[in-house]
């Protein structure tokens, strides 16, 4: 068993371009935020280790490009993901409407029992909000998927989103699931593709 951690979970952030995926990752992994927006090119990732129920869990979080032209690059990262976080922008109705399309991508490329989490980001922009919390919650409930509204800018629910995902995966793995080093299905077999760092908006 690897002494550094008990579990290694690979998470994937997906959603339309500009919804704040990179911002959520920066806030969770580095506790930083930037107003500038630089589009993620292809795929980027960060690692953060957390403690959950007395276990050390290493989270490898992959941030994907939302643009159509990168879909072929990013689709390969669905395989082997333990959890996928679908992000939309609460001030952008189209990004919410496209959640269904992203869920289809998960069905097409990810493993059958992958954990999912729906996140409505930019909750701090209350006056510009167009996607109703209740509507999104009901949609998530109909899929049996946890739902949270977050703000990468003021750190609202960001920690909770990733911790919820880690807890759901750990629950699915069950007490018999071994460490990242022992079980092949917990090993990360993707070759890291380092990209230009994604900015935020």
From Swiss-Prot:
One of its GO terms (cellular component) is synapse. It is a lipid-anchor. Prenylated; by GGTase II, only after interaction of the substrate with Rab escort protein 1 (REP1). One of its GO terms (biological process) is Golgi organization. Residues 173-201 are annotated as: Disordered. Residues 64-83 are annotated as: Switch 2 region. It catalyses: GTP + H2O = GDP + phosphate + H(+). A motif (Switch 1) lies at residues 30-45. Coiled coil: none annotated. SUPFAM superfamilies: P-loop containing nucleoside triphosphate hydrolases. It is found in: Cytoplasm; Membrane; Preautophagosomal structure membrane; Cytoplasm, Perinuclear region. The modification Cysteine methyl ester is found at residue 201. Its cofactor is Mg(2+). The modification N-acetylmethionine is found at residue 1. A lipid is attached at residues 200-201 (S-geranylgeranyl cysteine). A motif (Switch 2) lies at residues 65-80. Mg(2+) binds at residues 22, 40, 63. InterPro entries: P-loop_NTPase, Rab, Small_GTP-bd, Small_GTPase. Its EC number is 3.6.5.2. Regulated by guanine nucleotide exchange factors (GEFs) which promote the exchange of bound GDP for free GTP. Regulated by GTPase activating proteins (GAPs) including TBC1D20 which increases the GTP hydrolysis activity. Inhibited by GDP dissociation inhibitors (GDIs). Its main location: cytoplasm. Rab-1B binds GTP and GDP and possesses intrinsic GTPase activity. The small GTPases Rab are key regulators of intracellular membrane trafficking, from the formation of transport vesicles to their fusion with membranes. Rabs cycle between an inactive GDP-bound form and an active GTP-bound form that is able to recruit to membranes different set of downstream effectors directly responsible for vesicle formation, movement, tethering and fusion. Plays a role in the initial events of the autophagic vacuole development which take place at specialized regions of the endoplasmic reticulum. PANTHER family: RAS-RELATED PROTEIN RAB. This is Ras-related protein Rab-1B.
């Amino acid at each position: 068993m690897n002494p550094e951690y008990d579990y290694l979970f690979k998470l994937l952030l997906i959603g339309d371009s500009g919804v704040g995926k990179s911002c959520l990752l920066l806030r969770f992994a580095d506790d930083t935020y930037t107003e500038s927006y630089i589009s993620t090119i292809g795929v980027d990732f960060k690692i953060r280790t957390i403690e959950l129920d007395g276990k050390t869990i290493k989270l490898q979080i992959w941030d994907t490009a939302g643009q159509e032209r990168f879909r072929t690059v990013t689709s390969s990262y669905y395989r082997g993901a333990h959890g996928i976080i679908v992000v939309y922008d609460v001030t952008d109705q189209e990004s919410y409407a496209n959640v269904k399309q992203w869920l289809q991508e998960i069905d097409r490329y990810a493993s059958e029992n992958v954990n999912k989490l729906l996140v409505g980001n930019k909750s701090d922009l209350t006056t510009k909000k167009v996607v109703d919390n209740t509507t999104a919650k009901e949609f998530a409930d109909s899929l049996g998927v946890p739902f949270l509204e977050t703000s990468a800018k003021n750190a609202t629910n960001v920690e909770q989103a990733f911790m919820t995902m880690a807890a759901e995966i750990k629950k699915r793995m069950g007490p018999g699931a071994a460490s990242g080093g022992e079980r092949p299905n917990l090993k990360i077999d993707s070759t890291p593709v380092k990209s230009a760092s994604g900015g935020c908006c």
